[in-house]
């Protein structure tokens, strides 16, 4: 398996990417970490599509050979994983490598769930309470049902938040957006964290972890971090 450590995972919080490698190794894979490469997410979210296409074209030259060899590409940051699964096909539709890479891209939960249950080497989460904040891109593009089913198969009790955390990448950091960002977080995320102070806060998205840390003083963990047995 190829672990695609996106720009967020390489520069802002590498815990999730390292844990993805550990979990894959424990489950019989020989993970390779992809060379440095950006998918252009920040260009996409700010409407700079010409720049985004250049970054994606460069990324394809790195990832396509692995995909062509049948090696799954495992994403770490949900928003970047969603770029490969969805935006890539819209931005570079005439490049045959786009469909190849998009089809090979998986979430960690998808890779693990494809293994027979008897071959999964994962910790018991019996009795563990989890408040899960699916990243909006994860929820809308890849879906989060596979993640929830995997967690529940390990014994976890999962409270799944349906709304946005409110940070939404750079949105909540931009001038004039702070109050709205906090209001969105106050709709679901913050009251649920307050009601379940002992629960593990599970959030694959860097934005979702940042929002909870800054507004509630609550640390969050990536799915891989939880499965690797880390405390976060």
Where do the model's predicted regions map?
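Iron-sulfur cluster-binding electron-transfer modules in prokaryotic oxidoreductases
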Residues: 1-232
């Amino acid at each position: 398996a190829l672990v695609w450590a996106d720009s967020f995972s390489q520069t802002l919080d590498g815990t999730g990417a390292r844990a993805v490698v550990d979990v894959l190794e424990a489950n019989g894979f020989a993970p390779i970490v992809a060379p440095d490469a950006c998918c252009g997410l920040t260009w996409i979210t700010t409407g700079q599509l010409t720049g985004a296409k250049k970054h994606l074209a460069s990324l394809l030259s790195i990832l396509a050979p692995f995909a062509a060899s049948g090696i799954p590409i495992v994403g770490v940051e949900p928003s970047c994983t969603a770029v490969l699964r969805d935006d890539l096909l819209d931005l570079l539709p005439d490049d045959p490598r786009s469909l190849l890479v998009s089809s090979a891209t998986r979430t960690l939960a998808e890779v693990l769930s494809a293994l027979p249950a008897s071959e999964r080497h994962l910790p018991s989460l019996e009795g563990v309470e989890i408040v899960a904040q699916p990243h909006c891109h994860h929820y809308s593009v890849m879906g989060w049902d596979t993640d929830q089913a995997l967690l529940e198969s390990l014994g976890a009790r999962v409270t799944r938040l349906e709304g946005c955390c409110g940070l939404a990448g750079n949105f909540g950091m931009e001038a004039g957006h702070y109050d709205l960002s906090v209001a969105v977080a106050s709709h679901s995320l913050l009251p649920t964290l307050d009601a379940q102070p002992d629960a593990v806060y599970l959030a694959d998205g860097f934005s979702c972890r940042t929002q909870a840390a800054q507004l509630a003083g609550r640390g969050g963990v990536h799915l891989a971090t939880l499965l690797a047995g880390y405390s976060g």
